[in-house]
């Protein structure tokens, strides 16, 4: 019997228990369960409250700068040959990535719940910057947990968070990356339940977070549908997005899931290759387990201990994935592939030189997959990729690898 039966619509999940097939759910400490249930109740109310939607739409337009443009990459298309390549330019949002879409939605929920303190975890620092930004905008204190390794390799974003008034707390346990930062944030939350709102940055964690984050990020895919119809008169043949925790990808994919003609490719961090442990390709090389409140694909050993992975990209350096992606993989609706560090670096440089756009290392992974696929497709076919972050934060990492002293 299939544990993940094919539904009438790929867009109907999660169920009332927060499950996508066998994935998702709500695995949290007893102390947190009342708060999680309060959050779910507030989220259910907010979803049907016209004033909530109106305030979020206003902020998206006048604060974030939405809609973000749909851009035809003419020179890159000519360089690669084959399919026409479009970018959804979410790196042009206020704060430089898609993360602000989610943070604005969640800060409005925190306000509705009367919370007076914001905590967040961050890897690349983009979610940390977006969290610090919305906390400043609404006058709330913000503490950001960040792995010590990431503090070092994402120095520009650490400075931005501090400028915005947030306290950045480095986490040195484990490998000092995103998983460890999330562990510390959860510990803080358990200790300070009453006044604290935990602003999770990706489409993972206990229900209702995966659903909430997806809904706030779906503005990407909804805009893309309208813009693509206006530009080409039809939907794209293929969507491509990077997946770390998976929020930018699910935001692009979800509004297209019931369109059979649209193929979808999620691109994981292949790191230094899948042979050893120096990668973060949990869907390609992992197995189902429970981490950070939800059941999903994880990088784990035979005893169920979580492995410390690797990626050149701090935002993809996470040993799990949002549960909806796990479900979409198992039912075969979305294809997930790994891209190695070296391939992402090559893509980073190609886009910079052909289009004058410096991408973050996260979407550079998606671009590397586009570079493989576009030449094999017809000139009448269309690829739409989510350019989910800009590369200012990565210039020190890339400069060091390329031998360009900064």
UniProtKB/Swiss-Prot annotation:
Signal peptide coordinates: none
GO terms, molecular function: tryptophan synthase activity
Its EC number(s): 4.2.1.20
Organism: Allorhizobium ampelinum (strain ATCC BAA-846 / DSM 112012 / S4)
One term under GO cellular component: cytoplasm
Cofactor: pyridoxal 5'-phosphate
Subunit annotation: Tetramer of two alpha and two beta chains.
The protein's name: Tryptophan synthase beta chain
Entry function: The beta subunit is responsible for the synthesis of L-tryptophan from indole and L-serine.
Keyword Lyase: yes
Recorded superkingdom: Bacteria
């Amino acid at each position: 019997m299939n544990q993940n039966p094919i539904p009438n619509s790929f867009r109907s999940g999660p169920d009332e228990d927060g499950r996508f097939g066998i994935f998702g759910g709500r695995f949290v400490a007893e102390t947190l369960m009342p708060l999680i249930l309060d959050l779910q109740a507030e989220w259910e109310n907010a979803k049907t409250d016209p004033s909530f939607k109106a305030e979020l739409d206003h902020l998206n337009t006048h604060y974030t700068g939405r809609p973000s443009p749909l851009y035809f990459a003419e020179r890159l298309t000519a360089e690669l040959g084959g399919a026409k390549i479009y970018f959804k330019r979410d790196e042009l949002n206020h704060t430089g990535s898609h993360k602000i879409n989610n943070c604005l939605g969640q800060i409005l929920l925190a306000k509705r719940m009367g919370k007076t303190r914001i905590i967040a975890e961050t890897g690349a620092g983009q979610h940390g910057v977006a969290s610090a930004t919305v906390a400043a905008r609404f006058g709330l204190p913000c503490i950001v947990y960040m792995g010590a390794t990431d503090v070092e390799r994402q120095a520009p974003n650490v400075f931005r968070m501090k400028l915005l008034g947030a306290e950045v707390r480095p986490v040195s346990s484990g490998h000092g990356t995103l998983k460890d930062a999330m562990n510390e944030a959860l510990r803080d939350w358990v200790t300070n339940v009453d006044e604290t709102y935990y602003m999770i940055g990706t489409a993972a964690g206990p229900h209702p977070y995966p659903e909430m984050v997806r809904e706030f990020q779906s503005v990407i895919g909804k805009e893309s549908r309208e813009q693509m119809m206006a530009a080409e008169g039809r939907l794209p043949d293929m969507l491509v997005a990077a997946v770390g925790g998976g929020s930018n990808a699910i935001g692009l994919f979800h509004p297209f899931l019931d369109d059979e003609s649209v193929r979808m490719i999620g691109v994981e961090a292949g790191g230094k290759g899948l042979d050893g442990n120096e990668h973060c390709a949990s869907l390609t090389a992992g197995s189902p387990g429970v981490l950070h409140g939800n059941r999903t694909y994880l990088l784990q050993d035979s005893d169920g201990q979580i492995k410390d992975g690797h990626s050149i990209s701090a935002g993809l350096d996470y040993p799990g994935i949002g549960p909806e992606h796990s479900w979409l993989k198992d039912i075969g609706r979305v294809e997930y592939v790994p891209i190695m560090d070296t391939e992402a670096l090559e893509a980073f440089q190609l886009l910079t030189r052909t289009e004058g756009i410096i991408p973050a290392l996260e979407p550079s992974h998606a671009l590397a997959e586009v570079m493989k696929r576009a030449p094999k497709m017809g000139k009448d076919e269309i690829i739409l990729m989510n350019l989910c972050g800009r590369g200012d934060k990565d210039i020190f990492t890339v400069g060091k690898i390329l031998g360009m002293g900064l």
